[in-house]
Amino acid sequence: MPEYPGISRDAFRHPLDQQAEAALRAFPGFDIVARKFVEFMYERPQYVSLMGNSVQVGPQQYSTLYQMFRECVQSLDVRPTPTLFVTQNPMVNAYAIGEEQPCIVMHTGLLDLLSDDEIRTVMAHELGHVKCGHTTLTQMAIWAMTTASVIGELTFGIGNMISTGLIYAFYEWRRMAELSCDRAALLVTDDWRLVGNTMMRVAGGSDRFAHELNFAAFEKQADDYRNLDEDGLSQVYKFLLYNGGGSGPMLSHPFPVDRLSYL
């Protein structure tokens, strides 16, 4: 596994991540005020909850995962070393939280589906969030969104206009942040096909039919999806799908085929 001692987040951050973060931070007072709120009202309760309700990975607990995780941490030179937790959940997912006490959480559903190399890929992706400082920004944004909503109620709806703009900026940044973390996974694994295959497995992998998954077909699917942009109406549909469109939630992640194309 390659190692990058002293690597800066700017060495691999996607330009779209940087641009979207700049837009999000443009809201006055967003950064300074929210940081202290996160420290005392968000990060610590999350850590206490994980300690009480999940399994903390260590040398004597999920030792194989612990060794894999340590290698990924060393590869990206992530400091301080995050704590890894496994939580009982069939949903194929993992996430990163915290800054003072950064944590990576992996669902059992993900561990049961993926191979060791694919699990390393996910670990590296989540460590990318920690390395890039995404965890704090996500928590700050959630707090700011809630605050803007409350202000809207107290100011006869005026603050809701602020809230709407902030929500759009937040979700746009969250999606672009994933592109940086896919790059982090690529740095650690040094295997583009492995990262792409992991995306495919998370998107629609099946243990029973794993032998029938075809990465070349998934690549073609990504190309076909991108070619839909030649039709203006399809571009509108894509925008609506990402941004709620009145019938669903805004998406926090780009579609897997989009991520594959960006990678």
Task: Describe the role of every protein-language-model region.
Residues 29, 86-97, 166, 186-263:
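Active-site-proximal gating segments in proteases and membrane effectors
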Residues 1-100, 168-170, 206-207, 227, ...:
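Hydrophobic or amphipathic, alpha-helical segments that drive membrane association/targeting
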Residues 69-74, 174-196:
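An active-site-proximal "capping" alpha-helix that borders the catalytic cofactor pocket
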Residues 69, 106, 125, 181, ...:
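Divalent metal-coordination and catalytic microenvironments
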Residues 127-146, 153, 192:
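Catalytic Zn2+-binding segment of zinc metalloproteases
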Residues 143-178, 185-188:
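Post-HExxH zinc-binding segment in Zn-dependent metallohydrolases
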Residues 56-60, 105-121, 169-175:
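Short pre-active-site segment immediately N-terminal to the catalytic Zn-binding motif
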